[in-house]
Amino acid sequence: MAASTDIAGLEESFRKFAIHGDPKASGQEMNGKNWAKLCKDCKVADGKAVTGTDVDIVFSKVKAKSARVINYEEFKKALEELATKRFKGKSKEEAFDAICQLIAGKEPANIGVTKAKTGGAVDRLTDTSKYTGSHKERFDESGKGKGIAGRQDILDDSGYVSAYKNAGTYDAKVKK
């Protein structure tokens, strides 16, 4: 079997992958999604000797019939089954040691995770200096919002429409 340092690293990797993506997980049990992620990230599933389908089949074999998760002991059984398939020319013990070395000390990778986009349309929408029309009146020169003063239309109840320029000159034109 694998050396004690490999076993400790293997258990640590099991716990890290078991809690990945689930803030409520205890790290004692791993679901099928995280098992598949572990096999893919640690290069156990290489796409040739071991495929994603093989990984799912082994998971289904080792878990209990009604269970949806595996514990650490079932995890080791699953690795033994995959080890002989992944490393065909080696004995069972050598293959298990090799697969333990692939997994020991690894963490879930965040490759392919979507990053915040900062170009094109997003830049125009978040830069207040580029606002036009009535929206630019809602912000001062520094880009800070003016609050209610920037949003509130002051009611002009003088009787004139807003575009009329000669407000207040009618009485001067008409003599009484």
UniProtKB/Swiss-Prot annotation:
Region span, Disordered: 132-152
UniProt GO MF annotations: tubulin binding
Biased composition (Basic and acidic residues): 134-144
GO CC list: microtubule; microtubule bundle; perinuclear region of cytoplasm
InterPro entries: EF-hand-dom_pair, TPP/p25
Inducing stimuli: Up-regulated by estradiol.
Keyword Transcription attached: no
Chief location bin: cytoplasm
Modified residues (N-acetylalanine): 2
Superkingdom of this protein's organism: Eukaryota
Subcellular location: Cytoplasm; Cytoplasm, Cytoskeleton
This protein's UniProt keywords: Acetylation, Cytoplasm, Cytoskeleton, Microtubule
Pfam name, any one: p25-alpha
One of the GO BP terms on file: microtubule polymerization
Family: Belongs to the TPPP family.
PANTHER family per UniProt: P25 ALPHA-RELATED, TUBULIN POLYMERIZATION-PROMOTING PROTEIN FAMILY MEMBER 3
Function according to Swiss-Prot or TrEMBL: Regulator of microtubule dynamic that has microtubule bundling activity. Required for embryo implantation; possibly by regulating beta-catenin. Also required for decidualization via regulation of beta-catenin.
UniProt protein name: Tubulin polymerization-promoting protein family member 3
Protein's organism: Mus musculus
Gene name of this polypeptide: Tppp3
